[in-house]
Amino acid sequence: MSDYVYELMKQHHSVRKFKNQPLGSETVEKLVEAGQSASTSSYLQTYSIIGVEDPSIKARLKEVSGQPYVLDNGYLFVFVLDYYRHHLVDEVAASNMETSYGSAEGLLVGTIDVALVAQNMAVAAEDMGYGIVYLGSLRNDVARVREILNLPDYTFPLFGMAVGEPSDEENGSPKPRLPFKHIFHKDQYDANQHQQRKELEAYDQVVSEYYKERTHGVRTENWSQQIETFLGRKTRLDMLDELKKAGFIQR
């Protein structure tokens, strides 16, 4: 890996304020082609990407998300787990492929495919000088997003991505990640609780200092406090039902 690519990836951070400058069609096509170059399990290509250009559709998706940058960006992509085309093949072949793509394994395979495509696009966009932010908030109301985007059975909207030129007011920076030794295990998982807690305490201090410096003392919470707040909430408890309605996790 060249130092350029390494540094580009290391400098990644979410951008939430964009200039009012739409991406051109050629740029959009290049980003999608970069995404399609990602690895795909067994050549299944279990994804579709919806480019949302209609302001009225973006506005409706913003209502679901609650985030202004769903509307105010250079371009909005929605990444869809897609077995609909495989279902069409199955209807002709009559080989009962639904047993596979309607399973939990099928869901995992498809979700991984979509994530790889999206990350390829994110890196390509940042290489072009654009900023990006992922939008998991589109899952706040999956049924409504499916209706807005006219999604058929055997498809599922996983997340979105807003792309564009960062606003002059944008001052984001990379957040400190967990230490290498905390997430990289040699040969077997190291579940030593004492060591893990010790490393987390040190990391919590790093994160707290990061927020304190960036916000001039307004925020001082650490990583453990953040995940306690986030994972302590009961959110999107309808997800299993919505997945089943779309044809997934049937077995």
From Swiss-Prot:
One Pfam entry name: Nitroreductase
Coiled-coil blocks: none
GO molecular function: oxidoreductase activity
Enzyme class: oxidoreductase
Keyword match Transferase: no
Keywords: Flavoprotein, FMN, NADP, Oxidoreductase
Cofactor dependency: FMN
The UniProt record lists the keyword Repeat: no
EC number(s) reported in the record: 1.6.-.-
Function: Reduces FMN, organic nitro compounds and disulfide DTNB. Involved in maintenance of the cellular redox state and the disulfide stress response.
Family: Belongs to the flavin oxidoreductase frp family.
Name recorded for this polypeptide: NADPH-dependent oxidoreductase
The species this protein was found in: Staphylococcus epidermidis (strain ATCC 35984 / DSM 28319 / BCRC 17069 / CCUG 31568 / BM 3577 / RP62A)
